């Protein structure tokens, strides 16, 4: 912008006199107005989100959150097999504790939700997230070291102890005169687990002397225990307690052991390229007013029609 300084004014007065000086001042004024009009083609916007110069500020949205918002829906991978009270079909609608949790996350993101139930195993749920075919994996997923190499895990939303259900006759032969604790810790029998589940890995780690046999589903594992095909089955305490609640007479042929020093932490799987989504999910979990525990899960099972 052109400026008229005091020295310029004095010099012009000495050289030109009053009338020429007035003409010069008028020229400077017109020039200044013209420059101002040229430099301010856009009006100054004043609102709550402006920079120091009054320019509107646009807050960038991280790529992982932007992807979900642009799509308009959160895609959640969930196991194809119903697992009440976590997720199951009721009157044609998917419901359950984990379904409610997934809907809460979508609600906070202000998008719709779509459940993808193509996965036939827990590991396939993890794979779908790792391959970016789903934003989240919510399916009673345990955190394991191999899984943590291909996905992020949220903070746990439920912690359960590990547990065994044992065939009484087969276990008695195995235990002989040993103490129960010693026999369990040095378990040398056969142990049934669900194939492609976290407990396949847990069994090999915590019971290295056992012969681990994989079955396609939990019912097949329980059949093997009841028939004496395996000495015991290995899973979390909820599944073992559910077994006894559904069939109280099972205590006549089966015995259970809860492993208090081994925990199964259930978490949400998130893609490794989605760090902001991970932080967001953790924040949603931390703000949940009603934290889950084994008692609430068992009560929810009781309420299921």
Features from the language model and the residues they span:
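Bilobed "Venus flytrap"/periplasmic-binding protein-like clamshell domains
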Residues: 81-83, 94-108, 163-217, 237-239, ...
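Bacterial N-terminal signal peptides
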Residues: 19-30
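Acidic, polar ligand-binding/catalytic clefts
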Residues: 103, 107, 112-184, 254-261
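Periplasmic-binding protein-like
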Residues: 80-81, 158-165, 171, 237-286, ...
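Extracytoplasmic small-molecule ligand-binding "clamshell" domains
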Residues: 44-140, 149, 214
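A ligand-binding cleft/hinge motif common to bilobed small-molecule-binding domains
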Residues: 123-124, 140-149, 205, 219, ...
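Ligand-binding clefts/hinges and TM-proximal coupling segments of bilobed small-molecule sensing domains
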Residues: 42-58, 194-207, 254, 284-305
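N-terminal secretory signal peptides that target proteins for export/translocation
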Residues: 1-12
């Amino acid at each position: 912008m052109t400026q008229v300084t005091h020295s310029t004014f004095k010099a012009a007065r000495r050289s030109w006199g009053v009338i020429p000086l007035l003409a010069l001042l008028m020229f400077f004024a017109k020039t200044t107005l013209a420059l101002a009009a040229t430099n301010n083609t856009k009006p100054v916007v004043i609102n709550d989100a402006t920079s120091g110069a009054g320019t509107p500020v646009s807050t960038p949205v991280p790529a992982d959150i932007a992807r979900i918002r642009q799509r308009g829906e959160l895609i959640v991978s969930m196991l194809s097999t119903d697992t009440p009270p976590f997720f199951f079909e009721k009157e044609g609608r998917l419901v359950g504790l984990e379904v409610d949790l997934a809907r809460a996350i979508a609600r906070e993101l202000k998008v719709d939700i779509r459940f993808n139930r193509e996965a036939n195993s827990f590991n396939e749920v993890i794979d779908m997230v790792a391959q970016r075919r789903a934003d989240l994996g919510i399916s009673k997923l345990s955190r394991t070291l191999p899984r943590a190499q291909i996905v992020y895990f949220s903070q746990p939303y439920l912690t359960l102890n590990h547990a065994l259900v044992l065939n009484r006759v087969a276990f008695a032969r195995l235990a002989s005169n040993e103490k129960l604790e010693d026999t369990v810790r040095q378990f040398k029998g056969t142990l049934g687990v669900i194939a492609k589940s976290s407990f396949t890995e847990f069994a090999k780690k915590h019971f290295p002397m056992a012969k681990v046999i994989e079955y396609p589903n939990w019912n097949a594992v329980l059949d093997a225990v009841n028939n004496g095909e395996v000495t015991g089955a290995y899973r979390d305490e909820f599944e073992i307690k559910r077994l006894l609640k559904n069939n109280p007479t099972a205590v006549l042929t089966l015995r259970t052991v809860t492993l208090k020093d081994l925990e199964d932490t259930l978490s949400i799987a998130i893609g490794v390229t989605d760090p902001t989504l991970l932080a967001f999910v953790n924040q949603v979990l931390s703000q949940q007013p009603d934290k889950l525990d084994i008692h609430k899960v068992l009560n929810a099972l009781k309420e299921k029609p």
